[in-house]
Amino acid sequence: MAYPMQLGFQDATSPIMEELLHFHDHTLMIVFLISSLVLYIISLMLTTKLTHTSTMDAQEVETVWTILPAIILILIALPSLRILYMMDEINNPSLTVKTMGHQWYWSYEYTDYEDLSFDSYMIPTSELKPGELRLLEVDNRVVLPMEMTVRMLVSSEDVLHSWAVPSLGLKTDAIPGRLNQATLMSTRPGLYYGQCSEICGSNHSFMPIVLELVPLKHFEEWSASMS
């Protein structure tokens, strides 16, 4: 999860988020090299008196500045497309959870179980216990098994929302009348926090998301106690 004065991303907890972090570093290095080259050329132009006022045609230069950007774009596009296809791929999920956005809370339904559904509201600041996080704790956490593929079906019953958990690399729009889906898989247990990431009204900032990833045995015990 995030911590005060944090500058980087949250720790990756899913294979998709790990890929996104690698892609970020890859793209940032390319941007850094381009920026360094541009700054070097600008400083060279400002500090030297050598100019080419008589140059009317330079096919070699035009060829280079056409081919080089194309190569750079390919180096950025290929890994990006790979991750996009990975995020859309869903192969035989072990569990399906339907998420509905409301003003201003989330409701969850475990479609593989009978009568396993609940609403998830933010715990007001006045009711927080010592050690709990302000504006991030909920009364009902979403308990999921770790190291298993989980399909999230996301929609809304009123306005646009967005179901997002940064450490898992998840951000799926909740649109009324439309069912979007996303896949998540956690590589380790723990609590993972997110928030609605689409402005949805006056209490938009009071729609936290808390996922509790546990071993399969603990998940089965929890689901049996909830049914």
From Swiss-Prot:
Instruction: Provide the membrane-side ranges marked Mitochondrial matrix in the record.
Output: 46-59
Q: Which residues bind Mg(2+)?
A: E198
Q: Does the keyword Mitochondrion apply?
A: yes
Cofactor binding mode and count: Binds a dinuclear copper A center per subunit.
Gene Ontology BP, a term = ATP synthesis coupled electron transport
Checking Pfam families in the record gives:
COX2, COX2_TM
Its main localization is mitochondrion
Q: Where would you find this protein in the cell?
A: Mitochondrion inner membrane
Q: What is its EC number?
A: 7.1.1.9
Q: Which SUPFAM superfamilies has this protein been placed in? A: Cupredoxins, Cytochrome c oxidase subunit II-like, transmembrane region
List of residues binding Cu cation A2: C196, E198, C200, H204
Cross-referenced CDD domains: CcO_II_C
Transmembrane region positions? 15-45, 60-87
Membrane association type: Multi-pass membrane protein
What this protein catalyses is:
4 Fe(II)-[cytochrome c] + O2 + 8 H(+)(in) = 4 Fe(III)-[cytochrome c] + 2 H2O + 4 H(+)(out)
Question: Which InterPro entries does the protein's record reference?
Answer: CcO_II (IPR045187), CcO_II-like_C (IPR002429), CcO_II_C (IPR034210), Copper_CuA (IPR001505), Cupredoxin (IPR008972), Cyt_c_oxidase_su2 (IPR014222), Cyt_c_oxidase_su2_TM_dom (IPR011759), Cyt_c_oxidase_su2_TM_sf (IPR036257)
Listed GO molecular functions? Answer: copper ion binding; cytochrome-c oxidase activity
Regions of this protein lying in the Mitochondrial intermembrane compartment: 1-14, 88-227
Q: Which GO terms describe its cellular component?
A: mitochondrial inner membrane; respiratory chain complex IV
* Keywords of this entry: Copper, Electron transport, Magnesium, Membrane, Metal-binding, Mitochondrion, Mitochondrion inner membrane, Respiratory chain, Translocase, Transmembrane, Transmembrane helix, Transport
Complexes and interactors: Component of the cytochrome c oxidase (complex IV, CIV), a multisubunit enzyme composed of 14 subunits. The complex is composed of a catalytic core of 3 subunits MT-CO1, MT-CO2 and MT-CO3, encoded in the mitochondrial DNA, and 11 supernumerary subunits COX4I, COX5A, COX5B, COX6A, COX6B, COX6C, COX7A, COX7B, COX7C, COX8 and NDUFA4, which are encoded in the nuclear genome.
Q: Name the PANTHER family on file.
A: CYTOCHROME C OXIDASE SUBUNIT 2, CYTOCHROME C OXIDASE, SUBUNIT II
Q: What is the stated purpose of this protein?
A: Component of the cytochrome c oxidase, the last enzyme in the mitochondrial electron transport chain which drives oxidative phosphorylation. The respiratory chain contains 3 multisubunit complexes succinate dehydrogenase (complex II, CII), ubiquinol-cytochrome c oxidoreductase (cytochrome b-c1 complex, complex III, CIII) and cytochrome c oxidase (complex IV, CIV), that cooperate to transfer electrons derived from NADH and succinate to molecular oxygen, creating an electrochemical gradient over the inner membrane that drives transmembrane transport and the ATP synthase.
- What family is this protein classified in? Belongs to the cytochrome c oxidase subunit 2 family.
Put simply, this protein is called Cytochrome c oxidase subunit 2
Organism, by scientific name, is Antilocapra americana
**Primary gene name:** MT-CO2
